[in-house]
Amino acid sequence: MDQFDKKARAAVENLLFQCAEGTPGDTLLIVHENLGHDYYDANLHRLISNHATALGFLVELFPIEFDPDVKAPSAELIKATSSADHTLFVARLGDQIRFRTDTQNNNKIISYAIDSDTLASEFGIADYKGFEALKVTINNLMMKALSLIHI
């Protein structure tokens, strides 16, 4: 395994074990945009799938078309996400529907690494729990600041 693959595997471990709190044997649905949209790296979903499978996850790929005006996820997607333990969006749709209640049945992850190099970078392998702790600290500071500011 070369250095790139080691980092990519570490990033997938970070996504699946730290962020998703998954375990080997869990099902993982990877929702990805069809080839030709060129927003996400065309190999990213396969790279993640290969490492997830090697880590013991049962992976299913779910290709979608990008729709800039999406109003609701398809019935097929809702059914697929409902039956998976974890859903990883390697698609802009994840951000478009992340607050919808009809897709809240499982653990959703939205990848902001849009290409293989970003996934296998320091960003991709940075400890997810560390980012969560940083987010909590920043939110607490903002809430304290808002209570002290009078407009």
List the predicted regions and their residue ranges.
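Membrane helical hairpin/interfacial module
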Residues: 31-32, 37-72, 77-84, 88-89
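Generic structural signal for well-ordered, non-membrane alpha-helical segments
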Residues: 5-13, 37, 41, 45, ...
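Conserved small/polar residues in nucleotide/adenosyl-binding loops
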Residues: 149-151
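Alpha/propeptide regions of enzymes that mature by internal proteolysis
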Residues: 50-54, 58, 135-146
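Short, well-ordered coil/turn elements that cap or connect secondary structure elements
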Residues: 23, 54-56, 104-106
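N-terminal basic/disordered segments at the start of proteins
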Residues: 1-26
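Residues at the starts of beta-strands that form the adenosine-phosphate
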Residues: 27, 58, 108
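A generic, well-ordered mixed alpha/beta core segment in the N-terminal half of proteins
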Residues: 75-130, 137
